[in-house]
């Protein structure tokens, strides 16, 4: 069941989302060759706690960290670690903050120093996919209008769209309805209504969209071990159009 939020509830979610946005604003200039994802983890957790919020993923279904840190061929749910990032890497940092019982969720892919033209194109197209999806997130449209725009743009640029990891509604729970992949057909899927709050988070791959899960039960990698990128915002549907609650 899709839970529609009041304006008051949307503002409460926005406060949690802005904690997450501050994490990303703070870390962006710090991501350079030599930094570790453990260090990024500490920066994010410190900011979340400073605001009186909680790092929601820490302890979620046994997950042990405040962030997911996904490097190069890791699509999502990578663990922070002590290995320094290297020139040419790309890294996606995803975090969820809980503030006063409401959740905010955002992921962003960062370049580590100078990256390859392929990685640059992948990051650019993935961000464009996010923007195209948001543009279709209007009351009266359907989820398929968003996802088809994302899929068409990614595939027309020669990239894959991950099917097995989903975007989701969000509020007091992390995974509310609708849960949906970033592929589809225009005019299909649930109708978008004012008061809906959900993520748009395309995961785009250099090669195949197919993936594997590491033995740790979490880390999702591209099957062909080529690069993956992701950009995620939490948005609210209003009479005026989509509002980006995690705007940085």
Residue positions per predicted region:
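Active-site neighborhoods and metal-handling regions in enzymes and metal-associated proteins
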Residues: 1-248
